[in-house]
Amino acid sequence: MATTNCRICGSSFACPINERFSVCESRGATLSDFLLYFRRKYIETSPGLISYLNALQAEINELFSAIKEVSRSEIRHGSCEDKCQPSSIQKGKAEA
């Protein structure tokens, strides 16, 4: 356990070396305090990480958009309704 002031919540109590947010939260730190700490510790020290995270976020957004579109398409075409009919559920149970 470290005995220096915590870099997230500023507490003079010993915080775990890995600086878990749950410990600091119990001492009054907010999520924005933790995000600011995370940004200072990791992002500002590695400029390449910022562009990587931005690209990753864009890919995740595209993936969620594609999932939403597929879900809408299946609902419009009745695919979900066909799979969820009681007769098909009973048929599946009988085959098992």
Swiss-Prot record:
Keywords: Transport, Viral movement protein. Residues 76-96 are annotated as: Disordered. It comes from the Viruses. GO terms for biological process: transport of virus in host, cell to cell. The keyword Transport applies. May be involved in the viral transport within, and between cells. This is Putative movement protein.
